């Protein structure tokens, strides 16, 4: 969802609060952020909306996601509030930011996360904070699986972790940590990948335990 563009010379409206959504996906070892062109102006904008009186902010974020993508992110969390005097498409002086993670979809508005300099200053800070939140929550929540389709290979899962963490992981240690977390199960199907042997497909299927870690333990990597 995008709103009308703000005039560069018009100050933020006091008391106006926007909800901004940083949608993040994964493709070809890169994180991508959803950003739309600003109407009647140069630049980009994150999807945003203005809550009506009595609206729950979580619900507003869900509505924004549905309007932008037609679906709700598999994982979504409030990142924080951002306030400054910089221009915002809603002309708001305060923005509540949510981060959402979803699998890749064919949309012209996905952009590599380091190529969103055309966003306004406040929204650029939201992207930076959202990516940091995703990294810090990677161990505590099944975020990495939210980037992937229902069925995936272990190599795809490892590449997703490597992309989010921005570092290479040892294959054997990663798979031991994944096995110790009881998070995946084989589907019984295989996928051909290049000239090598077909790769086994897995799905996210966490085993119920009294003390559950919902992500792969990063200290084991």
Where are the regions that the model predicts?
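Long, intrinsically disordered, low-complexity Ser/Thr/Pro-rich regulatory/activation regions
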Residues: 186-221
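N-terminal strand-loop-strand
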Residues: 2, 6-44
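Short proline/glycine-enriched turn/loop segments at secondary-structure junctions
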Residues: 9-10, 87-88, 189-194
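Conserved Nudix-box catalytic region and its N-terminal flanking loop in Nudix hydrolases
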Residues: 29-71, 138-153, 159
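Short helix-coil junctions and helix-kink-helix linkers
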Residues: 159-168
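Short, well-ordered beta-strand micro-motif
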Residues: 23-25, 99-101, 201-203
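Active-site segment of metal-dependent pyrophosphate-handling enzymes
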Residues: 15-19, 58-62, 66-107, 135-144, ...
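NUDIX/MutT-family hydrolases
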Residues: 97-100, 106-139, 147-155, 160, ...
């Amino acid at each position: 969802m995008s709103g009308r563009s703000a005039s560069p010379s018009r100050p933020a409206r006091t008391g106006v609060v926007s909800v901004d959504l940083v949608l993040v996906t994964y493709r070809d070892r890169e994180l991508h952020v959803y950003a739309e062109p600003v109407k009647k102006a140069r630049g980009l904008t994150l999807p945003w909306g203005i809550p009506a009186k009595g609206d729950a902010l979580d619900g507003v974020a869900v509505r924004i996601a549905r309007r932008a993508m037609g679906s709700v992110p598999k994982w979504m969390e409030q990142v924080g509030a951002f306030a400054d005097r910089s221009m915002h498409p809603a002309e708001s002086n305060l923005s509540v930011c949510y981060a959402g993670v979803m699998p890749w979809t064919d949309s012209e508005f996905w952009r590599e996360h380091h190529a969103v300099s055309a966003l306004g200053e406040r929204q650029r800070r939201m992207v930076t904070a959202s990516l940091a939140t995703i990294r810090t929550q990677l161990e505590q929540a099944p975020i990495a699986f939210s980037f992937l389709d229902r069925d995936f290979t272990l190599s795809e899962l490892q590449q997703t972790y490597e992309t989010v963490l921005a570092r290479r992981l040892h294959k054997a240690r990663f798979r031991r940590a994944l096995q110790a977390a009881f998070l995946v199960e084989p589907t019984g199907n295989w996928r051909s990948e290049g000239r090598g042997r077909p790769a086994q497909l897995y799905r996210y299927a966490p085993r119920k335990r009294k003390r559950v870690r919902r992500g792969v333990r990063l200290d084991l990597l």
